[in-house]
């Protein structure tokens, strides 16, 4: 009975000493890991990246510190293995082996960084999608500007053509009217004047013949009976004023008509020439009017072309930004994969250590 109590007391002391050793070793190990983690330069921000700004002396000190800490960890691990070997004889179902303390706190840090990078990757993916939509909208706007530019050019061309054709038609009509009036003056007034001139010439010829006949014919009337021996010679006979007026009155009337017709012809010719000049001037100004009406369409087309260039520039910038965002997302994804590989390696090391410990315990 005393021997059994002695064994129980020894086992109790052994458990207490083992727990104290385990607690002290865990505290020392945690401090060592904290020191190691303090030397890891890790910046977590919008784009978390690992940055190292140490010089050669600091790197040498850090390597020495890491080597020293590794030796401490190795000694603590050996001591822990010995303690576990001693505790293996006193284990009960209520006092099972707990190896959770063998996991480093760096795993939690790496997991947090991986989660942050995953959120960053999601944000970058959304940003890339939004930039792609912006690029698509800019391209669509550029296409619409091209369509509007074509419509403006088409409408301005149609407007200019219609204006030019309309003004040219008006001028041509005016010119045709002047030519028609000139032809009418030639057919009517000038022809009438020429006909009257011929009639006047015939009348003068007949009058001259009549005068010659009256002068050269013998005087048989009663007025010559009283002349007697003092009869006048034929060349001394003169016509009375009434006789001359009666003979020349048809010629005067014809000459007036001729003068009237010629004046009318000249006036009609001038009017026709004026219409022709107006028509030609109108047709010459049709090109200018067409260019003026087309200039508005060209201005609208230039504005649409400017909007098109702006839309194309916006689309190009959005595409470049989207490409940069995609590249950043891919880089973040690669970094996440590296962190996941590190976590996987840690888990495998932990499983291997646990298996080794279990094998040693069974041994």
From Swiss-Prot:
Belongs to the SctB/SipC family. Component of the type III secretion system (T3SS), also called injectisome, which is used to inject bacterial effector proteins into eukaryotic host cells. IpaB/SctE and IpaC/SctB are inserted into the host membrane where they form a pore and allow the translocation of effector proteins into the cytosol of target cells. The core secretion machinery of the T3SS is composed of approximately 20 different proteins, including cytoplasmic components, a base, an export apparatus and a needle. This subunit is involved in the formation of a pore, called the translocon, in host membrane. It is a single-pass membrane protein. InterPro entries: BipC/SctB (IPR005427). Keywords: Host membrane, Membrane, Plasmid, Secreted, Transmembrane, Transmembrane helix, Virulence. The chain crosses the membrane at residues 99-120. It comes from Shigella dysenteriae. The keyword Secreted applies. GO terms for cellular component: extracellular region; host cell membrane; membrane. The gene is sctB. Its main location: secreted. This is Type 3 secretion system translocon protein SctB. The lineage of its organism: Bacteria, Pseudomonadati, Pseudomonadota, Gammaproteobacteria, Enterobacterales. It is found in: Secreted; Host membrane.
